[in-house]
C-alpha cells in the first residue's frame, strides 16, 4: 500500500516507497485559478494538497499531518510567485480521532488558518456534500503530484483529471480486505489515469461538492489498481462539530 506523500531528504522531494510514482497521471493542465478551492500544503516545499471549505478551514488527509504547515492559496505555478497567492500559516491541525495510519481508515484532517483567507475569484471555498455520490458520478481530481506512472516528473502548474467513481464491488475486488466504508475508488480500471504522490490530501469534487480526499493506492495509474479516496460524506458532522468547537 502506498500513500501519496513526500519526504524531504537532503533538500530533495522523494516519493516513497521506492517503486511508486509521483503526480496526477494522464491528466491535463487545469488553467490558472480554475480550481480556486485547491491549496498547497508547504513546509519549505509542496508536500500535500488540501481543499478550502471556508475562509479559515482546510480539509486534507490525516496522513499529510506534520507540524509547521504553511497553507498556500490561489496557487497555479507553485515555483513562481504570480501575485494571486495567499500564504497563511496553520494555527492548528486536527487529525480525525479514529485515524489508523496502518489501514488509512478515517484519513481526514482539518487545518485551521491563523487568519482568514480573503475570498475572491482565485481563492474560494468548496461546499461539503449533503449526500454521498453514487457510482458512475464524474468528478474532478487535482494536484501538483507526480505525472508519471513509472519514474518521476513533478509539475509546476496544477494538473486536473476527470474520473468516475467506481462501484464498491469493483473497488473491493481491486483491494481485497482493504476498503472500508469510509473509502471509495475512482478512476479507470484499464489504468493510465490516476492521482499519485504529491496529490495526497487534495480534492475530489463531484457536482460542485467535495466528495473525496486523495488518500492511497497501489502504484499510480496501474491496471486494476484505481486510486482510493476518503469518503467525505461520512465526515460532514465531524467537520461541522470540530469547526464549531475550535
From Swiss-Prot:
Q: What class of enzyme is it?
A: hydrolase
Instruction: State what inhibits or activates this protein.
Output: Is inhibited by scorpion cyclotide trypsin inhibitor TopI1.
Alphabetical GO CC annotations of the entry are: extracellular space; serine protease inhibitor complex
Q: Could you tell me which residue ranges the Peptidase S1 domain spans?
A: 24-244
Any one GO molecular-function label of the UniProt entry: serine-type endopeptidase activity
Q: What is its main location?
A: secreted
Q: What is this protein called?
A: Serine protease 1
Origin species, per record, is: Bos taurus (Bovine)
Lineage, broadest ranks: Eukaryota, Metazoa, Chordata, Craniata, Vertebrata
Amino acid at each position: 500500500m502506498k500513500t501519496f506523500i513526500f519526504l524531504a531528504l537532503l533538500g530533495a522531494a522523494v516519493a516513497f516507497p521506492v517503486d511508486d510514482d509521483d503526480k496526477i497521471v494522464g491528466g491535463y493542465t487545469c488553467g490558472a485559478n480554475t480550481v480556486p478551492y485547491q491549496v498547497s500544503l508547504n513546509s519549505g516545499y509542496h508536500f500535500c494538497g488540501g481543499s478550502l471549505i471556508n475562509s479559515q478551514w482546510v480539509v486534507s488527509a490525516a496522513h499529510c499531518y506534520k507540524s509547521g504547515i504553511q497553507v498556500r492559496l490561489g496557487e497555479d505555478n507553485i515555483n513562481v510567485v504570480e501575485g494571486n497567492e495567499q500564504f497563511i500559516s496553520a494555527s492548528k491541525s486536527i487529525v480525525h480521532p479514529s485515524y489508523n495510519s496502518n489501514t488509512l481508515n478515517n484519513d481526514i484532517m482539518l487545518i485551521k488558518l491563523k487568519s482568514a483567507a480573503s475570498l475572491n475569484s482565485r481563492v474560494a471555498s468548496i461546499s461539503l456534500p449533503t449526500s454521498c455520490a453514487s457510482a458512475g458520478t464524474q468528478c474532478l481530481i487535482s494536484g501538483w503530484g507526480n505525472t508519471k506512472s513509472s519514474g518521476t516528473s513533478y509539475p509546476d502548474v496544477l494538473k486536473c483529471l476527470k474520473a468516475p467513481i467506481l462501484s464498491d464491488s469493483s473497488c473491493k475486488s481491486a483491494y481485497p480486505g482493504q476498503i472500508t466504508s469510509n473509502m471509495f475508488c475512482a478512476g479507470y480500471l484499464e489504468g493510465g489515469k490516476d492521482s499519485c504522490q504529491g496529490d495526497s490530501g487534495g480534492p475530489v469534487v463531484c457536482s460542485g461538492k467535495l466528495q473525496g480526499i486523495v488518500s492511497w493506492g497501489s502504484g499510480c495509474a496501474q491496471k486494476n489498481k484505481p486510486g482510493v479516496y476518503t469518503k467525505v460524506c461520512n465526515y460532514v458532522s465531524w467537520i461541522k462539530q470540530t469547526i464549531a468547537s475550535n
